[in-house]
Amino acid sequence: YTSVFKEYLYSILSRNTPIEYFIEGGRSRTGRLLPPKTGMLAMTVHGHLRGRAKPIVFLPTYIGYERLMEGSTYVGEMQGKPKEAESIFGIVKTLRKIERIFGKVHVNFGEPVFLDDILKQHNADKIQIEKNDAPIPAEVSNVVSSSANVILENINRAVVINPVSLLSLILLATPKHTLDEEICAKQLDIYRDLATQQPYDERTQVTSLSGKEIIAYGLKLKLIKRVQHVLGDIIAIEDNQAVLLTYFRNNILHAFVLPSLV
């Protein structure tokens, strides 16, 4: 099977056809990037060294969500439940959720990774592979590992700091996941301004919404709720949403690591 698939991939590369695949190999259960799965990447490099039609460029792509359609499934898996097998009933349940509000999907492109540049860095640019079943030399294995790490780093740099991620970051750090509304709005403004003025990377994108607008947005998505109080309204995470919001918090944690050390 591997030989057939490698040959198929080689034929696609020979025709200069764009290819999409996911470097993590599967969906993250935590919201953080997974260690790279290098199988497809290794086959791509192998095919390139068999016959260089055109230079290969990997375009790291960040995809961020504001709400997960399979949120209940995610929470169950985080609590140790086995992954459910796909079924017709499951598809019908998913279709019924389409009418709900799921916010936006954010797509952002990271710095391109040029394969030929990494081959040169590892002194592997002169290597040629003659056959489909020829093993990958050690230098090329290093190229594959290096390419995978750079792709993941560039995905992280292209992070989109969206309203839901900021809400999650702030409310999950509070006792009982609640905060005075005025203080919450100010905290959101501070974090947004920090991410804007001290960006994680030039490709990082930050929401333009103010703290009050972010709160209104979270209420619209039914991820948080407003609790009336005589001393001032309280913003709290909706029931059973705390575990789910850890996913969105973890999406952006790396962007605040260095500022948190100051």
Mark where each language-model region is:
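Membrane-interfacial terminal anchoring regions of lipid-handling membrane enzymes
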Residues: 1-262
